[in-house]
Amino acid sequence: MRWEDFRTSSNVEDRRGMGLPGGAGGLGIGTIVILGLLGWALGIDPRILIGGAEMMTGGGSGYQQQQGRQGTPQDEMGRFASAVLGNTEDVWSTVLPQQANRQYQAPKLVLFSDATRSGCGGAQSAMGPFYCPLDQTVYIDLSFFEEMQRRFRAGGDFAYAYVLAHEVGHHVENQLGILPRVQERQQQVGRAEANQLSVRVELMADCLAGVWAHHSNQRWRSLEPGDIEEAIHAAEAIGDDRLQKQSQGRVVPDSFTHGSSEQRMRWLTTGLKAGQIQACDTFRASRL
């Protein structure tokens, strides 16, 4: 992937090495890890458990006090993340008005190590990358890319770019008004249906990542041989069925929150081929 040619984003905040702020006011790292593992075992998004615990302890109010370094990081992986974010900004600032008649407001990207605070509560490396709609920010510990390579054998710069573009896809969903409606609905239904709604949200973000890649390649010729295979392999490696099989030896479809390997590969490919937001409407699709 020719990411070196991308414009770097100014919407990056680097908190790596800073640790958690606020000391006694927030959840401890051990608590965050336990809640993350509990969410994984129960099929519940860990961010829901952590965010709830933050509100109960009064620890969610101080996250804005943490300020990291602004601007383009100097290390290679930091520059990579900044460049991919910049390219998503360039793509969506054109595609969203053209296809959805909405102006694109770019999200922020926070790089952290181990743990930090977000508008949605505590963020811990074990949770993986995530998007917080409350502060319209993507959070990622870049060591996740090393874990992708080590644990899932899913490395490569375009595979890593797909992960970032997926989280930006959630921001696009938020700008389209989809996330607030889904979250409201999830509070009204049972766990199985709430999980199914989560799967639709995640698969749409996979597809939107494909839409970004389609237009990035069309405009900048950014993809190189093998890149698409890298991303599809990554999508396969992080499917709920595959992860559950690895971690607990069995698959529980009702607890899926992101979609199966087959679904994630198929929706990413749909976005790559179509380049259209409309093609990513998982909420009206007869087949997920």
Q: Predicted regions span which residues?
A:
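A Zn2+-metalloprotease active-site environment signal
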Residues: 6-17, 24, 28-257, 265-288
